[in-house]
Protein backbone atom coordinates (compact mmCIF):
# COMPACT_ATOMS: atom_id res chain seq x y z
CA UNK A 1 0.00 0.00 0.00
CA UNK A 2 1.49 3.35 -1.05
CA UNK A 3 1.46 5.85 1.82
CA UNK A 4 2.96 8.82 -0.09
CA UNK A 5 0.32 11.49 0.46
CA UNK A 6 2.04 14.77 1.34
CA UNK A 7 0.77 16.75 -1.65
CA UNK A 8 -2.95 16.05 -1.19
CA UNK A 9 -4.96 19.17 -0.27
CA UNK A 10 -8.59 19.90 0.71
CA UNK A 11 -9.09 21.04 -2.88
CA UNK A 12 -8.00 17.61 -4.10
CA UNK A 13 -10.68 16.01 -1.92
CA UNK A 14 -13.26 18.36 -3.43
CA UNK A 15 -12.21 17.30 -6.93
CA UNK A 16 -12.32 13.60 -6.06
CA UNK A 17 -15.87 14.00 -4.73
CA UNK A 18 -16.96 15.85 -7.88
CA UNK A 19 -15.28 13.38 -10.27
CA UNK A 20 -17.04 10.03 -10.17
CA UNK A 21 -14.14 8.36 -11.98
CA UNK A 22 -11.37 9.59 -9.65
CA UNK A 23 -9.50 6.98 -7.63
CA UNK A 24 -9.20 7.19 -3.82
CA UNK A 25 -5.91 8.64 -2.57
CA UNK A 26 -3.47 8.10 0.28
CA UNK A 27 -4.13 11.07 2.57
CA UNK A 28 -1.76 12.79 5.03
CA UNK A 29 -2.76 12.72 8.69
CA UNK A 30 -2.23 16.49 8.87
CA UNK A 31 -4.96 17.04 6.26
CA UNK A 32 -7.50 14.91 8.13
CA UNK A 33 -6.61 16.66 11.39
CA UNK A 34 -7.14 20.03 9.72
CA UNK A 35 -10.58 19.34 8.24
CA UNK A 36 -11.86 17.78 11.50
CA UNK A 37 -10.44 20.56 13.70
CA UNK A 38 -8.03 18.12 15.33
CA UNK A 39 -10.69 15.40 15.64
CA UNK A 40 -12.64 17.66 17.98
CA UNK A 41 -15.75 16.57 19.85
CA UNK A 42 -17.75 19.17 17.92
CA UNK A 43 -16.95 17.34 14.69
CA UNK A 44 -17.76 13.86 16.03
CA UNK A 45 -20.87 12.41 14.41
CA UNK A 46 -20.77 8.77 15.48
CA UNK A 47 -18.84 6.12 17.35
CA UNK A 48 -18.71 2.36 17.76
CA UNK A 49 -16.57 -0.38 19.17
CA UNK A 50 -13.95 -0.11 16.44
CA UNK A 51 -13.99 3.50 15.29
CA UNK A 52 -15.09 7.10 15.77
CA UNK A 53 -16.50 9.05 12.82
CA UNK A 54 -15.91 12.78 12.36
CA UNK A 55 -17.31 15.35 9.95
CA UNK A 56 -14.59 16.86 7.78
CA UNK A 57 -15.26 20.36 6.46
CA UNK A 58 -13.99 21.29 3.00
CA UNK A 59 -14.61 24.59 1.20
CA UNK A 60 -17.93 23.60 -0.36
CA UNK A 61 -18.32 19.93 0.52
CA UNK A 62 -18.26 17.67 3.57
CA UNK A 63 -16.64 14.29 4.11
CA UNK A 64 -16.84 11.65 6.83
CA UNK A 65 -13.55 10.61 8.44
CA UNK A 66 -13.53 7.22 10.16
CA UNK A 67 -10.75 6.97 12.75
CA UNK A 68 -9.97 3.43 13.88
CA UNK A 69 -9.58 2.82 17.60
CA UNK A 70 -6.46 1.27 19.12
CA UNK A 71 -8.35 -1.99 19.60
CA UNK A 72 -8.86 -2.16 15.83
CA UNK A 73 -5.18 -1.91 14.95
CA UNK A 74 -5.03 -5.12 12.97
CA UNK A 75 -3.05 -4.34 9.84
CA UNK A 76 -4.51 -7.25 7.89
CA UNK A 77 -8.07 -6.14 8.63
CA UNK A 78 -7.34 -2.52 7.72
CA UNK A 79 -5.57 -3.49 4.49
CA UNK A 80 -8.42 -5.84 3.57
CA UNK A 81 -11.02 -3.09 4.01
CA UNK A 82 -9.00 -0.62 1.94
CA UNK A 83 -8.44 -3.29 -0.72
CA UNK A 84 -12.18 -3.87 -1.05
CA UNK A 85 -12.99 -0.15 -1.10
CA UNK A 86 -10.38 0.59 -3.78
CA UNK A 87 -12.07 -1.90 -6.11
CA UNK A 88 -15.60 -0.55 -6.04
CA UNK A 89 -17.45 2.39 -7.60
CA UNK A 90 -21.23 2.19 -7.69
CA UNK A 91 -24.12 4.54 -7.00
CA UNK A 92 -25.34 2.25 -4.21
CA UNK A 93 -21.95 1.88 -2.52
CA UNK A 94 -20.54 4.60 -0.26
CA UNK A 95 -18.05 6.77 -2.15
CA UNK A 96 -14.52 6.09 -0.85
CA UNK A 97 -12.28 9.17 -1.02
CA UNK A 98 -9.05 7.96 0.56
CA UNK A 99 -7.17 6.44 3.47
CA UNK A 100 -4.40 7.26 5.92
CA UNK A 101 -1.93 4.74 7.34
CA UNK A 102 0.36 6.77 9.56
CA UNK A 103 2.92 5.39 12.03
CA UNK A 104 5.24 7.56 14.07
CA UNK A 105 7.39 7.18 17.16
CA UNK A 106 6.30 8.63 20.48
CA UNK A 107 7.93 8.64 23.91
CA UNK A 108 5.59 6.87 26.33
CA UNK A 109 5.98 6.16 30.04
CA UNK A 110 6.34 2.45 30.79
CA UNK A 111 7.42 0.85 34.07
CA UNK A 112 8.63 4.17 35.56
CA UNK A 113 10.67 5.12 32.50
CA UNK A 114 10.12 6.47 29.00
CA UNK A 115 10.35 4.21 25.97
CA UNK A 116 9.91 4.87 22.26
CA UNK A 117 6.67 3.35 21.00
CA UNK A 118 5.04 3.24 17.58
CA UNK A 119 1.75 5.11 17.42
CA UNK A 120 -0.50 3.88 14.61
CA UNK A 121 -3.16 6.07 13.01
CA UNK A 122 -5.51 4.31 10.60
CA UNK A 123 -8.26 6.36 8.99
CA UNK A 124 -10.73 6.13 6.11
CA UNK A 125 -12.39 9.05 4.31
CA UNK A 126 -15.82 8.86 2.64
CA UNK A 127 -18.50 11.07 1.16
CA UNK A 128 -20.77 12.48 3.86
CA UNK A 129 -24.47 11.58 3.77
CA UNK A 130 -26.57 13.81 6.00
CA UNK A 131 -29.63 11.54 6.13
CA UNK A 132 -27.76 8.98 8.21
CA UNK A 133 -28.42 5.26 8.30
CA UNK A 134 -31.45 3.25 7.24
CA UNK A 135 -31.75 2.13 10.87
CA UNK A 136 -33.72 5.16 12.01
CA UNK A 137 -36.02 5.02 8.99
CA UNK A 138 -37.03 1.48 9.88
CA UNK A 139 -37.83 2.32 13.49
CA UNK A 140 -39.49 5.67 12.82
CA UNK A 141 -40.07 7.13 9.39
CA UNK A 142 -40.69 3.96 7.39
CA UNK A 143 -44.13 3.47 8.97
CA UNK A 144 -45.23 6.50 6.98
CA UNK A 145 -42.75 6.25 4.13
CA UNK A 146 -44.41 6.00 0.75
CA UNK A 147 -44.11 2.67 -1.01
CA UNK A 148 -42.16 4.15 -3.90
CA UNK A 149 -39.39 5.14 -1.49
CA UNK A 150 -39.38 1.78 0.23
CA UNK A 151 -39.22 0.15 -3.20
CA UNK A 152 -36.39 2.51 -4.23
CA UNK A 153 -34.40 1.67 -1.09
CA UNK A 154 -34.87 -2.09 -1.50
CA UNK A 155 -33.97 -1.95 -5.20
CA UNK A 156 -30.87 0.13 -4.52
CA UNK A 157 -29.61 -2.24 -1.83
CA UNK A 158 -30.12 -5.20 -4.17
CA UNK A 159 -28.25 -3.45 -6.99
CA UNK A 160 -25.36 -2.52 -4.72
CA UNK A 161 -25.07 -6.05 -3.35
CA UNK A 162 -25.28 -7.55 -6.84
CA UNK A 163 -22.43 -5.29 -7.92
CA UNK A 164 -20.29 -6.44 -4.98
CA UNK A 165 -20.92 -10.09 -5.79
CA UNK A 166 -20.00 -9.48 -9.43
CA UNK A 167 -16.69 -8.12 -8.12
CA UNK A 168 -16.29 -11.31 -6.04
CA UNK A 169 -16.71 -9.31 -2.81
CA UNK A 170 -18.92 -10.52 0.04
CA UNK A 171 -19.96 -7.96 2.63
CA UNK A 172 -20.74 -10.29 5.57
CA UNK A 173 -22.29 -7.58 7.76
CA UNK A 174 -25.24 -6.25 5.79
CA UNK A 175 -27.75 -4.53 8.08
CA UNK A 176 -29.67 -1.23 8.21
CA UNK A 177 -26.95 0.44 10.31
CA UNK A 178 -24.51 -0.23 7.46
CA UNK A 179 -26.75 1.30 4.80
CA UNK A 180 -26.68 5.09 4.49
CA UNK A 181 -29.17 7.31 2.65
CA UNK A 182 -28.48 10.42 0.59
CA UNK A 183 -30.75 13.46 0.32
CA UNK A 184 -32.95 11.63 -2.19
CA UNK A 185 -33.18 8.45 -0.07
CA UNK A 186 -30.84 6.57 -2.39
CA UNK A 187 -29.24 3.78 -0.30
CA UNK A 188 -25.48 3.26 -0.16
CA UNK A 189 -23.87 0.21 1.42
CA UNK A 190 -21.01 1.01 3.80
CA UNK A 191 -18.68 -0.54 6.43
CA UNK A 192 -16.52 -3.15 4.74
CA UNK A 193 -14.53 -4.08 7.85
CA UNK A 194 -15.69 -7.71 7.75
CA UNK A 195 -15.80 -8.06 3.97
CA UNK A 196 -13.82 -10.56 1.94
CA UNK A 197 -12.43 -9.84 -1.54
CA UNK A 198 -12.07 -13.19 -3.26
CA UNK A 199 -11.09 -11.87 -6.70
CA UNK A 200 -9.70 -14.73 -8.77
CA UNK A 201 -9.12 -16.77 -5.60
CA UNK A 202 -12.66 -18.11 -5.47
CA UNK A 203 -11.49 -21.30 -3.79
CA UNK A 204 -9.98 -19.40 -0.84
CA UNK A 205 -11.43 -20.56 2.48
CA UNK A 206 -12.80 -18.24 5.15
CA UNK A 207 -12.87 -20.08 8.46
CA UNK A 208 -13.99 -17.26 10.75
CA UNK A 209 -17.31 -15.56 10.08
CA UNK A 210 -18.33 -12.54 12.14
CA UNK A 211 -21.33 -10.30 11.84
CA UNK A 212 -24.37 -9.05 13.72
CA UNK A 213 -26.96 -11.19 15.50
CA UNK A 214 -30.29 -10.91 13.77
CA UNK A 215 -28.73 -10.72 10.31
CA UNK A 216 -26.44 -13.76 10.38
CA UNK A 217 -27.60 -16.84 8.49
CA UNK A 218 -27.95 -20.00 10.65
CA UNK A 219 -25.13 -21.72 8.76
CA UNK A 220 -22.76 -19.04 10.07
CA UNK A 221 -22.73 -20.85 13.39
CA UNK A 222 -21.94 -24.40 12.27
CA UNK A 223 -18.15 -23.90 11.88
CA UNK A 224 -18.11 -25.13 8.28
CA UNK A 225 -15.51 -23.82 5.86
CA UNK A 226 -16.77 -20.94 3.75
CA UNK A 227 -15.65 -20.11 0.21
CA UNK A 228 -16.94 -17.56 -2.30
CA UNK A 229 -19.31 -20.16 -3.73
CA UNK A 230 -21.32 -20.31 -0.53
CA UNK A 231 -20.36 -17.12 1.34
CA UNK A 232 -22.38 -14.83 -0.94
CA UNK A 233 -25.47 -16.69 0.30
CA UNK A 234 -24.82 -15.26 3.76
CA UNK A 235 -25.28 -11.79 2.26
CA UNK A 236 -28.52 -12.89 0.61
CA UNK A 237 -29.89 -14.06 3.96
CA UNK A 238 -28.98 -10.71 5.54
CA UNK A 239 -30.59 -8.92 2.60
CA UNK A 240 -33.82 -10.83 3.18
CA UNK A 241 -33.93 -9.75 6.82
CA UNK A 242 -33.31 -6.12 5.84
CA UNK A 243 -36.11 -6.23 3.25
CA UNK A 244 -38.55 -7.67 5.79
CA UNK A 245 -37.69 -4.89 8.22
CA UNK A 246 -38.22 -2.22 5.56
CA UNK A 247 -41.62 -3.70 4.69
CA UNK A 248 -42.83 -4.16 8.26
CA UNK A 249 -41.37 -0.98 9.68
CA UNK A 250 -39.96 -2.81 12.68
CA UNK A 251 -37.08 -5.03 13.68
CA UNK A 252 -37.28 -8.76 14.24
CA UNK A 253 -35.65 -8.36 17.65
CA UNK A 254 -35.71 -5.66 20.30
CA UNK A 255 -32.58 -6.13 22.41
CA UNK A 256 -30.08 -8.35 20.66
CA UNK A 257 -27.41 -7.67 23.32
CA UNK A 258 -29.44 -9.80 25.71
CA UNK A 259 -29.38 -12.83 23.41
CA UNK A 260 -27.11 -15.24 25.24
CA UNK A 261 -27.66 -18.47 23.39
CA UNK A 262 -28.23 -19.43 19.79
CA UNK A 263 -31.39 -21.30 20.76
CA UNK A 264 -33.01 -18.14 22.16
CA UNK A 265 -31.87 -16.25 19.08
CA UNK A 266 -33.43 -18.72 16.65
CA UNK A 267 -36.64 -18.98 18.68
CA UNK A 268 -37.02 -15.21 18.54
CA UNK A 269 -36.60 -15.18 14.78
CA UNK A 270 -38.92 -18.12 14.26
CA UNK A 271 -41.69 -16.15 15.96
CA UNK A 272 -40.91 -13.04 13.93
CA UNK A 273 -40.88 -14.80 10.57
CA UNK A 274 -44.13 -16.62 11.31
CA UNK A 275 -45.93 -13.31 11.87
CA UNK A 276 -44.20 -10.85 9.55
CA UNK A 277 -46.78 -11.08 6.76
CA UNK A 278 -49.50 -9.62 8.93
CA UNK A 279 -47.23 -6.74 9.86
CA UNK A 280 -46.44 -5.54 6.34
CA UNK A 281 -47.70 -2.02 5.88
CA UNK A 282 -50.60 -1.65 3.45
CA UNK A 283 -49.51 -0.26 0.12
Regions found by a protein language model. Name each.
Residues 2-23, 27-31, 63-86, 92-152, ...:
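Cytosolic eukaryotic protein kinase-like domains
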Residues 57-63:
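Conserved N-lobe loop of protein kinases adjacent to the ATP-binding glycine-rich P-loop
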Residues 42-53:
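Protein kinase glycine-rich loop
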Residues 48, 88-91, 167:
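Conserved N-lobe motifs of Hanks-type protein kinase catalytic domains
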Residues 169-181:
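Catalytic-loop of the protein kinase fold
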Residues 159-169:
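Protein kinase catalytic-loop region centered on the HRD/HxD motif
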Residues 29, 34-43:
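Conserved N-terminal boundary motif of the eukaryotic protein kinase catalytic domain
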Residues 156:
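Catalytic core of carbohydrate-active enzymes
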